[in-house]
A protein has these predicted regions:
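Residue at a conserved register position within TPR or TPR-like alpha-solenoid repeats
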Residues: 30, 64, 84, 97-100
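Conserved structural position within tetratricopeptide repeats
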Residues: 11-14, 44-48, 82
Length: 103
């Protein structure tokens, strides 16, 4: 993880508050570092601004699961399934359904 990259992405997010892309990039950097609370907060912020196709919902579910917040994680995966189907990504939806089935 690069603190410089995190700082740059934060600056980009502040400069363009309606653009969700820097927030997604920031969440990925936090994910690489295992900073799960930051991942959750940043992805929730991203999801308020973006019509996500499922990927962010799955990442949110995984981060919440790392934190032991299983009910919230399962809800995120369910929303990921809905988003993936809505955007024509049945394989992604199936992967999330498999995660839910294995709980």
């Amino acid at each position: 993880m690069s603190e410089e990259r995190i700082a740059a992405l934060r600056k980009m997010a502040e400069a363009k508050p309606d653009d969700p892309r820097p927030r997604f990039g920031l969440a990925l950097e936090f994910e690489k570092a295992g900073r799960w609370d930051d991942v959750v907060q940043t992805l929730r912020d991203y999801l308020q601004r973006a019509d996500d196709e499922g990927n962010a919902w799955g990442r949110l579910g995984a981060a919440l699961r790392h934190l032991g917040r299983d009910d919230e994680a399962q809800e995120a995966y369910r929303k990921g399934v809905e988003a993936a189907y809505r955007h024509g990504h049945p394989t992604m939806a199936g992967e999330f359904e498999d995660v839910l089935d294995s709980w």
